[in-house]
């Protein structure tokens, strides 16, 4: 961890370490998609593109407005990410990343869906559901089971995940740690 950087640890309260401050817990639901269930359709209103680490600044910018604190520039190296871009009205300007989803934690045979977010100006169009379904199809192709973690108070995301077929497995604690210095 870099000085002043924050990270999150799943599970039990981590032991005290010099230079690391405990900043509290966030209750989350751990959800899983049944391995034998039919996959939901991917109904994206705009094309879905593979994202690379070259897109990391746009990915961080999106998460900073949609769900701050959980995505960093190097998170892109942890798995495959996909996004939906909104074309700029001025052709001389770059497109804007308006929604994304990917994977962060890979523990065979499970892969964690992560970074699911939509820019507030584009919510309600099914983008998060389409991207989540896209990642689920990607997982099925590699014989992986899709799992995810969602903050327990994020009712809209929980509804989307249930509609896609995810089942709640258990509640877990996500512990926030910050490096001092």
Residue ranges and their predicted role:
Residues 1-42:
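Acyl-donor-binding surface of acyltransferase catalytic domains
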Residues 4, 143-145:
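Short, high-confidence coil segments that cap the C-terminus of an alpha-helix
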Residues 9-14, 138, 147-158, 174-181:
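Conserved beta-strand-loop-alpha-helix junction that forms the acyl-donor binding cleft
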Residues 14-20, 129, 152-171:
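Conserved active-site alpha-helix within GNAT-family acetyltransferase domains
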Residues 23-34, 167-181:
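Conserved catalytic-core motifs of GNAT/GCN5-like acyltransferases
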Residues 35-69, 93:
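Short amphipathic alpha-helix that is part of the acyltransferase structural core
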Residues 70-81, 85-117:
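A conserved beta-strand-loop-helix scaffold within acyl/acetyltransferase catalytic domains
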Residues 118-120, 124-141, 158-163:
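Conserved acetyl-CoA-binding loop-helix of GNAT-fold acetyltransferases
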